[in-house]
A protein has these predicted regions:
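N-terminal catalytic or cofactor-binding beta/alpha core of small enzyme domains
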Residues: 1-90, 95-221
Length: 221
């Protein structure tokens, strides 16, 4: 997906069962002791020091790398153009299980946002217009679950448009379905991005002005 969008990708490279980089470091479920009622032995009974060391090993490098990536995009010299260039978009990508705690999740995609719904609104419109996938807003998780931490830290605090995509993981079980979903999501993101640019700079959009590319971030799930 990042390649299709010509966007930088920052990936945590660690399962959320080890450390959930998309949670505030002080949150208990950043290192969950259980998942769906099943104990995670390596996470049970950790001391404060053990939790701190794990945060330093997984959370801190991921968020430093993401911050550096965004800083680089925002400070990058630009060639003079005749139209305004939009700021980057932060898009985080995760997956969810079709059934959790015995309850089937009736959706294909979740589009999540916190206080800034600009890009999420456009993504939802694009997915619904396509008509092939069932999409839900702030599901199967939402801000109250603490999952918008990355959006807050790196999107909201900088004023960047942002959204989080949750994919039902039986739709991406094979390399073929992963590639197909990546192509679909890249198309959705590009269409939403173009709509945002058109709304912000209607004259530039009519003139075919250049825009910056989205940023992609993934905390392993």
């Amino acid at each position: 997906m990042a390649r299709l969008l010509d966007a930088p990708l920052v990936a945590s490279g660690v399962s959320r069962l080890v450390y959930d980089c998309n949670r505030p470091p002080e949150a208990d479920d950043a290192i969950a002791a259980e998942s769906a009622g099943v104990a995670i032995p390596g996470n049970v009974g950790l001391t404060a020091e053990e939790r701190r060391l794990r945060m330093e090993r997984y959370y801190a490098p991921f968020h430093r790398a993401l911050a550096a990536c965004i800083d680089g995009r925002l400070s990058r010299p630009r060639a003079p153009v005749q139209v305004p260039v939009q700021v980057p978009v932060l898009l985080t990508v995760h997956s969810f299980t079709p059934v959790y705690d015995g309850v089937r999740r009736e959706m294909d995609l979740g589009i999540l946002h916190d206080a800034d719904a600009r890009f999420a609104d456009l993504l939802i419109d694009v997915v619904e217009s396509d008509g092939d996938l069932m999409v839900r807003r702030n599901a199967p998780y939402g801000p109250k679950d603490g999952v918008t931490h990355t959006l807050i830290e790196h999107g909201l605090r900088r004023g960047l448009p942002n959204a989080m995509v949750e994919i039902r993981n039986d739709l991406i079980e094979s390399p073929e379905t992963q590639n197909a979903m990546a192509a679909r999501l890249a198309r959705y993101a590009a269409q939403a991005r173009a709509a945002m640019e058109s709304m912000a700079n209607p004259e530039a959009a009519r003139a075919g002005g250049a825009v910056d590319r989205p940023l992609a971030s993934r905390a392993a799930g």
